[in-house]
Amino acid sequence: MDLDLNNRMTEDETLEKAYDIFLELASFNLDPADILLFSLQFEIRGGAELLPPSDGWLKHVDFNPNPDFFAEVIIGLAESEDAEINDVFARILICREKSHPIYHILWKE
């Protein structure tokens, strides 16, 4: 797979794309109670964080996600506006290269 450093999504575009994917697939992968909780609380306590891919992804994908091209987006709820996300609804490994719309999601169990 040829990836181009000059054809990457920005961090904001990556967060937006990951969140759009989350919204599209959440109803098929999350418990209805979790969907309701997330919907009711997102404006107050919700968030999405962009991180380099963690080593944990090596257990779930058959390649090493290069941080130049892949990001991990965590979507969930925090205890307060200033706190870190502690109730994770999805971890999304997403390719930032625009011509390779690759992603993998680990859903809340």
UniProtKB/Swiss-Prot annotation:
Domain of life of the organism encoding this protein: Bacteria
Gene3D superfamilies the UniProt entry points to: dsDNA mimic, putative
Pfam families in UniProt: DUF440
InterPro entries cross-referenced by the UniProt entry: dsDNA_mimic_put (IPR007376), Put_dsDNA_mimic_sf (IPR036763)
NCBIfam families found in the cross-reference section: PRK05094.1
Sequence similarity: Belongs to the putative dsDNA mimic protein family.
Function field: May act as a double-stranded DNA (dsDNA) mimic. Probably regulates the activity of a dsDNA-binding protein.
Protein name: Putative double-stranded DNA mimic protein plu2488
Organism: Photorhabdus laumondii subsp. laumondii (strain DSM 15139 / CIP 105565 / TT01)
